[in-house]
């Protein structure tokens, strides 16, 4: 069994209000202790993320700088791929070949969106009113909550998070 996992809230790891056993569906064995995030923890995490989003350290970044951070994240995922694939195998019961493949795709998703981070632009929209203008602006959506199925957490999280940029 691995060490207990923790919540990450406001830049720090912490234990949840309680823990639960995560069972490997392929073996029926407990493979890890997972933290429960209850209403208080979720509210604190959302508040911390909202505050961080407004902080100049993030809000002041250009799209190109944000893209570079996504490239760095992709590199970190790739470096940790064997461990991440093992976690996914333990948690989902999938074979390691499949989870290894999915982790590689996760890194590629982040690289793809890193590459287009500074290339998305708004559009001027022609309309039939001479005294009006219409245009679109592409902006990050902000803090989100995403629920993904248990059987492909990292892969489906990458798909959801990256399309929101």
Predicted regions and their residues:
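Gly/Ser/Thr-rich helix-start
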Residues: 12, 94, 116, 123, ...
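A short local loop/turn or secondary-structure capping micro-motif enriched for an aromatic residue
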Residues: 23-24, 39-42, 154
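Conserved small-residue-rich beta-alpha loop and adjacent elements
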Residues: 123-165
């Amino acid at each position: 069994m691995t060490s207990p996992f923790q919540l990450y809230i406001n830049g720090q790891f912490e234990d949840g209000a309680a823990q639960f056993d995560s069972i490997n569906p392929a073996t029926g064995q407990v493979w890890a202790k997972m933290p429960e995030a209850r209403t208080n923890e979720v509210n604190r995490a959302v508040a911390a993320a909202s505050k961080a989003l407004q902080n100049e350290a993030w809000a002041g970044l250009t799209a190109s700088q944000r893209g570079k951070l996504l490239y760095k994240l992709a590199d970190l995922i790739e470096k940790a791929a064997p461990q991440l694939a093992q976690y996914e195998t333990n948690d989902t019961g999938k074979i390691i070949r499949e989870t290894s493949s999915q982790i590689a795709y996760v890194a590629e998703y982040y690289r793809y969106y890193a590459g287009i981070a500074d290339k998305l632009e708004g559009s001027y929209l022609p309309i039939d009113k001479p005294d009006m203008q219409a245009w679109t602006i592409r902006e990050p959506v902000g803090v989100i909550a995403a629920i993904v199925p248990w059987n492909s957490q990292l892969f489906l999280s990458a798909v959801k998070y990256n399309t929101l940029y």
